[in-house]
Amino acid sequence: VRALGFFLGAVLVAGPAARAQNGDHAGEEQPELPRELVVPAAPALSVEDEAKTFRVPAGVRIELVACEPLVHDPVVCVFDADGSLWVVEMRGYMPDVDGKGETEPNGCVAHLFDDDGDGKMDRRVVFLDKLVLPRAIAPTRGGVLVIAPPRLLFAKDEDGDGVADEVTVVDQGLGGIQSPEWAINALLPTLDNAWYCANVPWRYVWKGEKWQRERTSAAGQWGATKDDVGRIYTNNNSDPLRVDAISGVYAARNPNMGNALGVNLRVVDDMSPRPARMNVGVNRGYQKGQLNGEWKLASVTGACAPLVHRGTGVGDEYRGDAFVCEPTGNLVLRYRLRDESGAVKGEPVRNPDGLDFLTSTDERFRPVWMCDGPDGALYVCDMYRGLIQHRLFVTSFLRKQVLARGLEKPIGMGRIWRVRSAKGERAKAARLDRAEVGDLVSALGSENGWTRDTAQRLLVEEHDSSAEAHGRLRGVAQHSSSSIERVHALWALAGMGGIRKELVHSQRAELQHRWPGGIKDPDTRVQLAAVATSEGLAATDPDVLEDWLDIARNPGGGSGKLRQVMLSLGSVPTPRGLSAMMELLQTSAQWEEIRSAAVSGLGGRELDALNAIADSEEWRKPGPGRAELIALLARCVAREARGDRLEGLIGLSAGKMAATKWQCDALVSGVMAGRPKDALGKPTWIRLARKPGVLPEALDAAFAWPGKAGAEEAKVRDLTAEENARFEKGRVLYEGTCVQCHLASGLGQTGQAPPLRSSPWVLGKD
């Protein structure tokens, strides 16, 4: 091996200069590996030999579930209610180092079955084929949702032969062919009965007997997961774990403000992996800091597919921990999560030998997806190949190694592994496809997250009109001793249209005689779920709204309850809802996350809130955070740039707020912050249709109107035919690739992609 490694090192140095690659940066040097470096060979191994390369903690074992020819190039696997395994095969991914033939329709959805119950798959049925780079699947409503670029499909087997007969296009124009790793993926079932997708600012919900998009904040690159209380976790290649502490639906609902605080938050500060082998085959291994002194990966560069493990099959000490795939480092990382007053933080947990949770000395071990199974174990999709980097980013440095070391072949392999406790026999897998209503409701109390999630899904999808299901779920929501079971029961009822006042609201006298349940539940997690699920009641029922205010005024245990109530008040578009919000803000505006939560629900009503402040004697007094709240509201009105509201804002500054200097100053600062920017990124005019009747001097620099001296509008000419053709080509490219990261608004995503709108780099002359 040493002689072979030396020979390969020599080839890498002496070989002809590779042609420029998509991943090369202009003017960047890519130093060769040292001539004397011994690079271990990386032949394709049998499953038996690959298994010998794994290192896991004592007390944990790894077992084969499926391999070629039952599975090829697996990128996603999920279990259905009957214990069968759905596998998405991206067989067109990188056929060679240049990606030639990548768009051939050779991808498929395979359905694997363990016929004899021994834990290994025995049978493969191709459910759906002739797909281009498919990337996600979710069993639902008797079929499966499949992301097959550029479409989202719903496929169903109607005649029982295991092959899709009925295929419906649910959505299209999704992109994903040009850049597979930067496109919509995941299809994660959420606690609130939706389907979350990474990399795009929407999710899918079943509403009105059809699938619909629902706006949410965008995050993540490949994969998504959730914890027991429904928080969504994502990551990107260089940041192993991020979390939405609040629902992205709340965060994204006011475009005038932008995303509310509390989404896409960093969880992990330590980005270093601990591999078992050198990783010189990483794409930018030539860059300083990419590899350490042992030529091992120093910082994650391929982090993907996070999983919060919610099963019991690996061991109690692992439940609730986050696991992250790192295929470029040939490993799976593990993080211990802790909740610090609503903020989730994670610390890496290493094995006694100093390595990460699951490592391999096989360079072709490529973990790209994980899921929990019906037996409580953790399952890993191993794409098993030498080349994992996509052609859009391959550098000359990597290309040389791929060709010299034969890493591009063979392709079409793949393995799925089970990680479980080494103590005793494998736990029996739950099977819910034939479960009666009572059994499904009981399954909401399972210790395994997969079982709870699947039971909830089946109740919502198949028993939404069942009186028995509604009755049993109400009993669980109010009387179960398990708080997580009560949470699932509430969300199941919400998905079935079964939230009623008596479920979430308790009369004061009743509290002395029975378990309170609902909004007055003793467990914060249940209280938050009760508030969120009762949003449809609060607009018309003052008792429910008063319950919200009670726990917000006396939150206890941190500000989580107050923030949830503030978020939920945004769904009550009534005068009472607004007055309740302003009442709470009188004593809570000092917290930025509370101000943000409030304004997230005031899209189009920011001026109403400002008028409420101006009309209130209590708000005349300055206090912590009050000026910042006024500025934020004014900024939203300025950014929306709607003529009637801008006139109202100007009138407010010249009228009701004029006598209260601190209020007027805050309003002006918000307007100035909300001005649009020019091509150089400098603030410019907010344009009005006509000159306002009264304009405070402090706002003169913010507004322009026809005829204002020095504020003439630039004349815009029509595009030429050639320019229009280029524009259309760019539009298609942006919609197909760039929009996934930079969004349709061009505002980008925190921790993922910088803003392009008003960017000097985009609009400047240089």
Predicted regions and their residues:
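Bacterial N-terminal signal peptides
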Residues: 5-15
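Sequence/structural segment immediately N-terminal to covalent heme-attachment motifs in c-type
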Residues: 723-747, 763-766
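Positively charged n-region of N-terminal signal peptides that target proteins for export
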Residues: 1-3
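Long, ordered, helix-rich scaffold segments
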Residues: 381, 406-412, 419-733
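C-type cytochrome heme c attachment motif
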Residues: 305, 377, 415, 492, ...
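Beta-propeller domains with acidic blade repeats across secreted/periplasmic ectodomains
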Residues: 21-440, 450, 458-461
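Gly/Gly-Pro-rich "capping" loops immediately C-terminal to redox-active cysteine motifs
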Residues: 402-404, 479, 748-766
